[in-house]
Regions:
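Short, charged alpha-helical interaction segments and adjacent helix-coil junctions
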Residues: 2-9, 13, 17, 69-71, ...
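Accessory alpha/beta interaction modules
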Residues: 1-159, 169, 278
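Short amphipathic alpha-helical signal-transduction/dimerization elements
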Residues: 102, 106, 129, 167, ...
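C-terminal segments that line or cap access tunnels to active or ligand-binding sites in enzymes
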Residues: 157-169, 178-183
Length: 278
C-alpha cells in the first residue's frame, strides 16, 4: 500500500512547528547556541516542563517559540519567522513582539521567587527568512544604550537578536552559515546540516509528533475561523451602525442588509441613543 503523504512530510526547517521540534533536540540546539556565541556550553535545560502548543493570549496564533537556559543560567527564547508580520493598521509586529517575549521571560523568573536584581541574562533570538532592517547584516543584535552617548550601555543583560538568513555582511561560523543556507534552500552543505536533515526525517516519522501536528493544524484552523467570524461580526456591526445613523432605513431593511438579528439591532440602536445623549 502506498504511504499517504501528510502535510507534515512536506515541511522544511523554515516551518515554525518543525523548527520548534528540531530545537527540542538538545544536541542540535546547544550546538547552534555555541556557534552563535562562540563559546562552549556544558548543558541546556528547556524551561517549559512539558513542550506544548500554547495559544497567544489574544488568540491570534499559536506560540511556537522555544525557551532555554544554559549552565550559566543565561536564558534564550528562539523562534522562526518566515514572514514579516503586520497588524491591522499595517504596523510591523516584530519589534513589539520582542517586548512581549522579554516581559514573559522576566515574569517567569520573578514568579519563581527571584528578586529583580537577580534576573538572568536573556537573549531573544529570531531566525528570519527576510531582512527586517534591510542592511544585509547576517545578525542584528540590540542592547539598550544612551541616546546622548552611545558608548554608555544600560547593563540590564537583555539582548535581542535578529538572524537574517539572507544576510551577506558580518561574520558567522561555517555551521551557522550552512544552517542559514539549509533554512533558505533545504540543501545540505555541511556535516552539521546533514545531522539536522536526518533529525528532521526522524521527527517526521515519530507518531507522537505526527499526532501533535494534526492537533496543531486543527487548532490553527479553529483560530483562522474564529478570526474570520470576528471580522464578519465587526463588518455586520459597522453596516448596521451606518444604516441606523442615516435614519432612513426600517429595522427590517437593516436586518436584511447587515445580517444581524432584530434584537441585536434594537440593542445597538438603544446603545447609540445613550451614547448620543452622553
Amino acid at each position: 500500500m502506498k504511504k499517504q503523504i501528510s502535510n507534515l512530510d512536506k515541511l522544511t526547517l523554515s516551518n515554525d512547528f518543525l523548527f520548534k521540534h528540531v530545537m527540542l533536540r538538545k544536541r542540535i540546539c546547544k550546538h547552534i547556541l555555541e556557534e552563535l556565541f562562540h563559546t562552549k556550553i556544558a548543558d541546556i535545560t528547556y524551561l517549559e516542563a512539558e513542550q506544548t502548543l500554547d495559544v497567544y493570549p489574544d488568540s491570534h496564533g499559536i506560540r511556537l517559540d522555544v525557551r532555554i537556559a544554559d549552565d550559566t543560567d543565561t536564558h534564550y527564547n528562539l523562534e522562526m519567522q518566515v514572514k514579516n508580520p503586520v497588524n491591522r493598521t499595517g504596523e510591523f509586529q516584530l519589534p513589539k513582539r520582542t517586548r512581549y517575549y522579554q516581559a514573559m521571560l522576566d515574569t517567569d523568573m520573578l514568579q519563581k521567587g527571584q528578586d529583580y536584581d537577580e534576573l538572568s541574562p536573556t537573549y531573544i533570538i529570531f531566525f528570519c527568512l527576510f531582512d527586517f532592517f534591510e542592511d544585509s547584516q547576517r545578525i542584528y543584535t540590540f542592547k539598550r544604550r544612551c541616546l546622548e552617548n552611545m558608548e554608555i550601555e544600560l547593563a540590564d543583560e537583555a539582548a535581542i537578536m535578529f538572524l537574517n538568513t539572507l544576510g551577506t555582511k558580518g561574520d558567522v561560523s561555517p555551521d551557522i552559515q550552512s544552517l542559514f543556507d539549509y533554512i533558505n534552500s533545504n540543501t545540505v552543505t555541511s556535516k552539521f546540516t546533514r545531522e539536522v536533515a536526518d533529525t528532521i526525517t526522524e521527527i517526521k516519522n515519530d507518531k507522537k509528533v505526527r499526532d501533535s501536528y494534526m492537533t496543531y493544524e486543527m487548532r490553527m484552523k479553529d483560530i483562522r475561523e474564529e478570526s474570520l467570524a470576528e471580522g464578519e461580526a465587526k463588518q455586520k456591526l459597522r453596516v448596521a451602525k451606518l444604516m441606523l445613523a442615516k435614519g432612513c432605513y426600517s429595522l427590517q431593511e437593516i436586518v436584511e442588509l447587515s445580517g444581524l438579528s432584530i434584537d441585536n439591532i434594537e440593542k445597538l440602536k438603544n446603545d447609540m441613543h445613550i451614547e448620543k445623549q452622553a
